[in-house]
Structure formats: structure tokens, C-alpha cells
Amino acid sequence: MQTGVSYFSSRVLRHVRADLQDILEHGCTYVVHCFTETDLAYYRETMKGVVQATHDAGLEVWLDPWGLAGIFSGETFTRFPLDHPETWQVLSDGRRAPAACPNHPQTRAFLRGWVEACAAAGGDVLFWDEPHFYAGLWKGDMSGAWACRCDVCLGLFKDRFGYEMPAEFSNDAKAFRESSLLDLLAELCRSGHEKGLQNALCLLPTDLSAHGFPQPQERLRRALESRLGGAPPGAVDSMLHIGVGDFDTAASIPDLDIFGCDPYWYLFGTDAEKFMRVYGQAAAAAAGKRNRGLQMWVQAFSLPEGREDELRTGLRVAAQVGATHIAAWSYEATASMSSIRCPRPDLVWNIIGEEFRRLREL
């Protein structure tokens, strides 16, 4: 059992080294370092030092394209779309969204450059973190407009389906979005392997109702009815379709080594045991068919006070479904980020340490 935690707290090496010792003492075997666009622009050599310090501590280094191009998740900003406005995604209502289109050639060239930077830094694993098209729901946009209908996507859609892309969200639009992300990931994973890096993919839980969790969909529908007087056609489905729901196809990416998901039951307002088990079993089945490692994440941010012990439940279920890699987001219960830190970070971090040490003894 490999146990890890994400880290973005410092670029000052003496502080990083101290934190790495703390991470070791909490039972971790790997660290998921966020390698952002800020790092690409200003901290490339510094990141080499961070990677080396992590290796010196005896920990494996995973590198996360945190927030890159607005395609991968992360509480950080992206500059690439500002520098390349021609890559912006276009919403179904004609508005332009400040995130780069995964299908645009310049976006792909930029992301391949990130892979090269990770190889130069000496990383071990590329962690492809929740790839998705622009998610208006995350920005408070309740219109139901979805991406992407840029010229590149319109052309690719017509080539594949033989007709013009509809403005209303449909099964074909959903399939196109997923296949676009998977095609991008296949290209990036191939690039990673060519440079001697492993690849790990983490997908968000999606298709919630089909997996037995109708609550988020119903909450969103009620919110739209309250705010707009009703949900526009396809709005609920488009707003909740974030990422890739086809686990089997995702796990089949040829150059993928580790497949997983992050069933954050607090975030989705669901039961810890059931949510982790349902999505964990789905991820395990997909990973098992392709002989991939299985990674499961638990939420150590925005964790409600008084529910900290549910982490023990989530980690226990992750082990039961056969996870080879378990991780928590993020270091010290995200204490350094005030907007999403846990109310009692010390308690959360201690629970993670206790459970990680226990899991490694199994």
C-alpha cells in the first residue's frame, strides 16, 4: 500500500524539507507536488530542488498540472488562456470561457511542454488531475451553458457524428467531450512514457444518478427552479457532467499506469461508506481489466467540524476495494489555504497519519 498527500505550501527549500519530514512521520510514501503555471514561469529550477529534496527524504515524486490551462483542477490561476485568447472555449450560448480548449493544437503543445518540464525536474509520476471542460457550475454560472463549441470542436464533432453540433446538451455532445479529453490524455501519457515518467489519472465522480446518488441532481434542479423558474433543457445534465464518466475507456489509455478517482463524499453531500464503495468498486473494476494500479483519494479540505472520523471510514473502504495507492488532499488538512482549510486541521492531519501508518502495516 502506497500512501501520499498533495503539497503546494512552500517553494522555500528549508521549509519544504521540514514539511517532508512531517509527511514521512505521517506515514506517506509519495508526495503529489503541484507544478503550476507560476512554477513553469518562475520556479523551474526551484522545482528541481523540491523534487530532489523529496527524493532525498525517500519519497516518490508525483507532479500535478494544477490548474493548467483551466483544464485540470486546482485552486490557482491560469495564464495560458490570457496569452492565447484564440484557444478559449466557447459556451453553447456563444459566450467565451477563460479556459483553453483541450482540442486546440496550441493547448496541446503547451501541455506537452509541461511534461518536458516535469521530466527535466526529475519527477517520477505525472498525476493527471480531474481533466474537464469549463465547468460553469464551479464559477456560480447557473445558466446551464456548456463547452465547447469553438471552431475546432465544431469541426471535430461534425467529422465524427456527421452533423452540426447541437446547442442543446445531448448524449452525442457528452460523448464528444469525453472522447476529446481521453484523446488529449492519450497524447500526454504517451509523451510522459517517452520521457521515462509514469502516468496516473484521477477522475471526478460523474453520472451520479446512474450510480445511485440522485441527491446532487435534485438539489441542483431545485436551485434552478428557485432562481430561474425552471431548468432549461439539458441544463442539469450539462452542469453535472464534469470530466469523464466512462471509467473503462479511461483506464484503457495505452500509456496509463495508475487509474483512480476522488469520491469526496463531503463535497457531494453523500454518505461516506456508500460513495467511496460505489465509485471505488467502479474504478477498481476498470483498473483491474487493464492491470493498472488503483488510486483512491480522500478529502482533507473543507471537512465539516465533527465529521473528521469519517475519514477513517473512507480510508478503510479504499483499502477494501483494493487500492494500491491512497492519498489525501492535502498536506496538513489544507491549513495553508484559508478558503478551504478544515476547521480543525490538526485533528484531521493526525487522523490521516494514524490511518496511513495502519494501512501500511496491513
Indicate residue ranges for each PLM-predicted region.
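Active-site beta-loop-alpha junctions enriched in small/polar residues
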Residues: 7-11, 36-38, 66-70, 131-133, ...
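Substrate-binding cleft of secreted/luminal carbohydrate-active enzymes
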Residues: 256, 261-270, 295-360
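Glycoside hydrolase catalytic-domain groove-lining segments
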Residues: 62, 162-305, 314
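Aromatic-lined substrate-binding rim segments of carbohydrate-active enzymes
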Residues: 19-82, 169-193
